[in-house]
Amino acid sequence: MSIGVILFLIFTIFVLTQYFRFRSKKHEQQRSKLFQRLAGQMGMQFSAKMGSDFRKRLKAFNRFNNRTHRQGHRLSTIRNVLRNNVNGVETLFFECSPRGAGTGRNMEPIFYFKSSSLNLPNFHIRHFNIHQNLFLKSFGKGGVQIDHAAFSQKYLVQCSDENTVRKLFSDEFLDFISSNDSFDVDGNGDQMIVYRAMYEDGSTNNIGRIDLNEFKDVKQKAVKVYKYLSRPG
């Protein structure tokens, strides 16, 4: 292969790379404008990115602070932050991508809640399929045993304080989360997150970004999860 052909191929690859970067950047700008408009409609504040102080809060959660797992430290890219504080409940939404994954389809929609009405053990609810659950249980790693058939077939609960987390999960909550099995949930103290997780092992079908047309409905469901796990005011 001649030097001329090699240089041509390098140039072509460079041009295509720049083209796709431009398209991706333009798409992100358009998506951010739509989120900004949506925030105004819902009485929330919009910011394109998240500050470092809030990022530190997220390390309280298993999802963002598990150094031994490939899904840990997913704080590389955070976009489209919507925020409000009503009746002492701080609520945020943001999109978060795995470290090194860029954006595009690889962003999780995450709802964050902070309130004095929350007093949670450090727990993590992860969506699993029944075969994975059975495999883990055979090695004694099946997590907290929850007496709810539908929930136990779909979810793995990890928490060091098993009695507290069992008391926390009412039958109504377990029924609700089982029928809306696109959610994972993490809690710790006065904070919690409700999100659609992505896993490299293929254990969930929640690959892709939230459709803005379904945002209000998904937010309502996330708020309902928060209410199930909060103490009466």
Locate the predicted segments by residue.
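Feature marks short, highly hydrophobic, charge-poor N-terminal signal-anchor/signal peptide-like helices
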Residues: 1-9
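Transmembrane-cytosolic junction motif
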Residues: 15-40
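Charged, low-complexity intrinsically disordered regions
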Residues: 32-50, 56-233
